[in-house]
Every structure is written in structure tokens, then in C-alpha cells.
Amino acid sequence: MIELSPLIGTDIPTLTINSVDESRMKTMAALLRDPYPVHWDHEASKQLGIGNKVINQGPLNLSYIANMLIYWQGPTCIKRLKAKFLKPVFGGDTVIAGGKVLEVLDDTSSLVNCDIWLSRYQQTVVSGVAEIIITRK
């Protein structure tokens, strides 16, 4: 069994996406059957008054957080993930996924509760909590 108490307050290693890829947004829009053109059409974004950048889909933003957790504790570590989308992420933005261990939920199953977030230029754009199964120390 892994001793979890020392983990409380531990920062989860961050994951940085140096430039959110617009071509992935277009692919994701097709996969999700998302007809909203602001995910791939710069002109549509201009017409809506949000500038010349396309907006990243929420599932892609959440995937950055999920990948950060998986890199930290492995592919089966995520038990529960709850997130709130606060601000948009645009094509070309740099984003950083991060988190911190808040509490031990169950010593016998190595389960911890974590604060998670995605930031864009030092502003939180996604925030939430995750229940993570600790498999690595």
C-alpha cells in the first residue's frame, strides 16, 4: 500500500501546450458533429465579434487536463473528473494544465481528491476537481 498522507499539498506536474492547434479543432468539430463555425472559420469568429481567432472545443481543453493526470499517475488513474469552463481558449494560445492534491479520500484504495485547472496566459480558463487513484509515488 502507498502511504498517501505526504501527498497532500503536492503539485501535479504541469502539462504545457505551446500552441493550441487549429487543425485539431476542425477535426474535433467534425468528430463531434459540432456545426458551430467558430471552431474552424475565422470569418465566423469575426462576424460574432470575437476577433480573428477560432475557439477551441471544451472536450479538447478537458483532454489537456486528463492527459496531465495520466502522465502523472497512469492511464487508469482517473476515477472522476468534474470541470467548469470559465473562459475560451483560442487557436495558437499557450495553455498549461495543472493541479494539486487536496485530500486523501480512502487510504485503502489509494484515492485522492485533486484541484485541477487549465490556464491561458496566467488566467484560469477551466477549473475543477478530480478523484485520482494513486499508482505511483
Pin down the residues of each PLM region.
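Hydrophobic beta-strand-centered segment that forms part of the acyl-chain substrate-binding groove
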Residues: Q47-V101
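Catalytic strand-loop segment that frames the active site of acyl-thioester-processing enzymes
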Residues: M1-V54
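A broadly tuned preference for mixed-charge, low-complexity surface segments
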Residues: W40-D41, N52, S63-I70, D115-S119, ...
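HotDog/MaoC-like acyl-thioester-processing domains
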Residues: M1-T16, P88-K137
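Intrinsically disordered, low-complexity segments enriched in polar/charged residues with Gly/Pro
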Residues: L4-P6, R24, L32, W40, ...
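Solvent-exposed, flexible loop/coil residues
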Residues: R24, P35-Y36, H42-A44, P59, ...
